[in-house]
Amino acid sequence: MKRKDTLKDFRGKSIDQLQEAKIELLQQLFSLRMQKGTGQLKKNHLFKSAKRDIARINTIISEKNK
């Protein structure tokens, strides 16, 4: 159910808000990469969820641009 809630939230936002959310997720992904490199990361599943959310945002942005 969480994914559907996330999609509803993303679809309810404007393109500018989606761009901001995408930037935040990219920063989070960068932070996760740095933590993994230093051996501090314990939750590897966060990579997958961040990448998927970025892909969802990109899809919704392209849908709204049509």
From Swiss-Prot:
Give the UniProt entry's GO cellular component terms: cytosolic large ribosomal subunit
Q: Which GO terms describe its molecular function?
A: structural constituent of ribosome
The UniProt entry, under Gene3D superfamilies, shows: 6.10.140.1970
Q: Please, which domain of life does this record's source organism belong to?
A: Bacteria
Q: Which GO terms describe its biological process?
A: translation
> Which terms are listed as keywords in the entry?
Ribonucleoprotein, Ribosomal protein
Pfam families in alphabetical order = Ribosomal_L29
InterPro entries hit by this protein: Ribosomal_protein_uL29, Ribosomal_uL29, Ribosomal_uL29_CS, Ribosomal_uL29_sf
Looking up PANTHER family in the UniProt record yields: 60S RIBOSOMAL PROTEIN L35/50S RIBOSOMAL PROTEIN L29 (PTHR10916), LARGE RIBOSOMAL SUBUNIT PROTEIN UL29C (PTHR10916:SF0)
The UniProt entry's sequence similarity note says:
Belongs to the universal ribosomal protein uL29 family.
Q: What is this protein called?
A: Large ribosomal subunit protein uL29
Q: Which organism is it from?
A: Francisella philomiragia subsp. philomiragia (strain ATCC 25017 / CCUG 19701 / FSC 153 / O#319-036)
